Amino acid sequence: MLEAAFMTGLERNADIVHMATYAPLFAHVEGWQWRPDMIWFDNLNSVRTTSYYVQQLYAQNKGTNVLPLTMNKKNVTGAEGQNGLFASAVYDKDKNELIVKVANTSATIQPISLNFEGLKKQDVLSDGRCIKLRSIDLDKDNTLEQPFAIVPQETPVSIEGNVFTTELEPTTFAVYKFTKK
C-alpha cells in the first residue's frame, strides 16, 4: 500500500514528475538480488505481485488533467490529522471520467467523502465503480502456489448528486471512477 500512497504524490505533481520507472521487473524464485520485484517466475510459471497490480491500476486509470483534492484544505498526503490517507484525483477528458485514487495506509477503517465541486449545473455524475486492492496481512503477497491471493476487485458504487461517501478498509488502495454525463 505504501507504493500506492507514494504514487498519489507522483500523480498530484504530474506537472513536475513526467515519468517514473519500476525496477527490477523480474525475479526468479530461486535466485534474486533484492525485493520488491514486480513479476516472479520459475521455469514453468509466473506470478504478478501486488506491486504489479498497483502499477497496472495507475496505468489503466490515468487522466488528462490533475484535479485539486483536499482534506481540511490541505492536499491528502497522509499528513498529521489525515489518518494515513493519501489521495489524488484526475479527469480523463477522452472518457469523460472523474477518477479518484485513495490509499488507506492505516490499520483502521476510514470514512471517505468525495464532494465534486465546480461541476457545471448541467453536469451529472453517473453511478460509478470502485476497484480495490487490499490485504489485511501486510506480509502477504501473491506466490506461485497462490497467484491470485491479492488481486483487484471491482464493484459498482452509487453517488448522490455530486457527493460520494463510503468507508475505506485498512491497508487498502481504491480507485473510484465516475462518468460525467
Model-derived segments and spans:
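Aromatic/acidic polysaccharide-binding cleft in carbohydrate-active enzymes
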Residues: 1-87
